[in-house]
Amino acid sequence: MFEIRDVDLAGRIGRIYTQHGVVETPAFFPVIDVYRQEVSVDEVRAAGFGQVITNAYLLWKRFGWEAAEKGVHRILGFPGVVMTDSGAYQILEYGGVELSQGEVVEYQKRLGSDIAVILDIPTGDVGRREAEESVRETIRRALEARVMIEGDERIWVYPVQGGRYFDLVEESARVGGRLGFYRMYGIGSPTVFLERYMYHVVVEAVYRAKKHLPWGRPVHLFGAGHPLIFPYAVALGVDTFDSASYILYAREGRYITEYGVYRIEDLDYLPCSCPVCSRYTPQELREMDRVERTRLLALHNLYVISASMRRVKQAIREGRLWELLEETSRKHPSTARVMARMRRYIDALEKGSARGRGVVRGVRAYGLESLSNPRLSRFSSDAARLVEAMAEKWGGGKAVLKPLDPKPEPGQCESMVGGGEWILFYQPFLGVFPVEACGAYPSLQIDYPQEGLPAEVIGDLASKIASTVSILRGRGFTVRLEYCGKVEWQARAVEALKTAAAGDLPTVEACG
């Protein structure tokens, strides 16, 4: 049912197999409103979406059991994968629905949905007592539904609830993770937080939930429809998303970009090359009648979301998902806050970061966030352990620490071996590593600016050099350090060493 094809961090490129086709993840499900849909499903497909989601409760309200007789694919005129939500959003907005859990489940079966959701109780942004009740009732309903859904041909989703109460999120996920008759999991109630750009709450909920969910099952994030959240949620293990944001924003004259949402009246230029933006100017869009403007803005918003999904997939394929997180963190203050939180999850994310992927393209490092890039931090930790083990084995001698520039010339490692001294290299982000490890990925594949590195990065390097010097001296080595004062990062590292418990380290300037 779910085939994982590629992994970086906890993000996956995968395939969800359904009765009406295959969904390649990460994937976005545009919400189709059966009451009011300014963009046709054909246009949705043309924008790159072979899957959509619609609300089963609203289908029932409009068509009753007639929709079940025709089937949801025929009602929508959509031949691809259709996911149906149960009406939980209406509970969140209006306090209830007229259908029972059993009726909602049976209705989705008869609709012929490919992916369906039980009638859960969304938490939203409520007090602790209400949140506890939403989790308890959702769990009760999830257990109750077993006799109705076990063995069913469609994929049933277990909704994880708890909102901003992360212990409740974990409890909900822990129970759901043990219910094997659910072949997909959904994390609910993020919309109220996403609307306020409280992305840090959403990613924390995802992180807490994923700890208890089976690795081999896809995970859906309900109500997430902005490109700013996609890379972080995917990096934590979310596979699919849905939202009506593309059309809701369009109705208000709002224009989605990868770095925020603009009102069309505030734009003089369109920073996009999609079919809509290539044909029209902001002024032309503003002068259109409301219906046509809404349709075109919605199409643009869909194209942006589609492009964002492709960008995330490519980053996974290249092993550069962390670098995409860094890039996104500089697009909005809310994502900068999320990035700070992502560094706390590094142990969990590191497990999915392949050691050799992206060797041809290398690793790009920029600043403080790059220190937590799993491919760099893992090499640094491994190198430190290797230095200590080799120093212990050799039991003394002469050691010299030499700088290694980004992307050194081929053969540079070998050219420095010999002379009766043990050669160790040092680099920003990677720390100190022996010549024997020079060439191991990514020591020769890292690229970073040689000027203007943040003080924290230089301080981190100085600290790692000082630690290495202490280890070597403790094993009977005499140590000196070479540097080139003309190279800014090297000169700054030597200066920083004066306050890093290695002020007495002999240094020799050696340029060229």
Curated annotation (Swiss-Prot):
One of its GO terms (cellular component) is cytoplasm. Binds 1 zinc ion per subunit. Zn(2+) binds at C272, C274, C277. The active site is at D85 (nucleophile). Exchanges the guanine residue with 7-cyano-7-deazaguanine (preQ0) at position 15 in the dihydrouridine loop (D-loop) of archaeal tRNAs. PANTHER family: QUEUINE TRNA-RIBOSYLTRANSFERASE (PTHR46499:SF1). This is tRNA-guanine(15) transglycosylase.
